[in-house]
Amino acid sequence: MGSIATAGALTQTVAPTIDPVSLSDIKAHCRVDHTDDDAYLLGLITAATNACESFTGRQLIHATYTLKLDGFPGEIELPKPPLSSVTSITYVDTAGTSQTVSADDYQVDSASVVGRVMPAYDAYWPATRDGQYNVVTVTFVAGYGATAATVPIRLRQGVKAFAATLYEHRETVVVGAIKAELPEVCRALWYPFKLVRT
């Protein structure tokens, strides 16, 4: 099959439009009935979501990414599972011109734990320009869905539990630079989703 690309320059180009846990959810969980801490709680939800995605290696809510590679391998693994869709694959040809690979010329595996892309049957990746970095760009959408309900309940519960823990111990927390230890309940909830490289 040839080589597999598992590393490259990954950039999130379109961020999620919602959080996996709503403000009303976390306020109910923490028994908060005022609005004084709303902005602070939203920051904690973001921090807890980032912790979940870092721990598991997964993307919770739909986001768009670009992965840049120095050439076409036999197969391209797309990080931040689950893979939702591949938007486009572009490359710099041997003449230095940007081109787009036809969707008919590659196949997408979004059923595997880590999404993959490879040439369609009896098709080949095109030649790229030598001596130039980042000649291939794969644009794709990752995440369980566009709504919180599409995210597995264990992941959402862990986000809620961690945000609540941070709120209850706010004197030790600086949003954006959280040093708090991940609670065991979060580890237990998230561990089945943790990506493990073999």
Functional labels for PLM-detected ranges:
Residues M1-T198:
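Divalent metal-cofactor coordination and adjacent catalytic microenvironments
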